[in-house]
């Protein structure tokens, strides 16, 4: 069970509740459930990008490339992080962006959803919606985010 009182109390000194984690970690599912329990709006950054560009993330990667996607992801994410009292689910690679990372850590309550790599692989292996799941240059056993002070 989610301790809504504890999260609300923690959020009083913070702007938003932000969920981080690798692809398939449950950021969108958990974020949506917690937003409902807290009676707050939920923002899924991947869905926001698809809505703004009118196409799927898979198609964006295919037609415009990852660099285009990452720049647009940064723009949308930084804009949404300026809102107050919302629950936000970031894209799986968003936290590798130094501007997004800085803003998330500045005035937001954030949770990193961490799972065993076998669980993550099982969650994403049959998904057609994950454009870089198996084209990545790193493996799930070797985290793509290696930052001092942020164990992954």
Task: Label the model's feature ranges.
Residues 19:
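Hydrophobic anchor at the beta1->P-loop junction of P-loop NTPases
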Residues 22:
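P-loop (Walker A) phosphate-binding loop of NTP-binding proteins
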Residues 25:
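ATP-binding Walker
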Residues 28:
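Walker A/P-loop
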Residues 41, 45-105, 130:
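ATP-dependent small-molecule kinase phosphotransfer cores
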Residues 107-149:
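A glycine- and Lys/Arg-enriched "phosphate-lid" helix/loop adjacent to the NTP-binding pocket
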């Amino acid at each position: 069970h989610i301790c809504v009182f504890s999260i609300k109390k923690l959020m009083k000194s913070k702007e938003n509740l932000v969920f981080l984690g690798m692809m398939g970690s449950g950021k969108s599912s958990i974020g949506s459930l917690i937003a409902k329990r807290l009676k707050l709006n939920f923002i899924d950054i991947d869905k926001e990008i698809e809505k703004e560009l009118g196409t799927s993330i898979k198609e964006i990667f295919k037609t415009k490339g990852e660099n285009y996607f990452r720049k647009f992801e940064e723009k949308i994410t930084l804009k949404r992080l300026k809102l107050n009292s919302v629950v936000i689910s970031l894209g799986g690679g968003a936290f590798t962006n130094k501007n997004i990372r800085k803003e998330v850590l500045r005035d937001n309550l954030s949770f990193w959803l961490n799972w065993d790599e076998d669980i993550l692989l099982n969650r994403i292996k049959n998904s057609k919606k994950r454009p870089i799941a198996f084209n990545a240059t790193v493996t799930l056993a070797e985290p793509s985010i290696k930052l001092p002070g942020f164990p992954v």
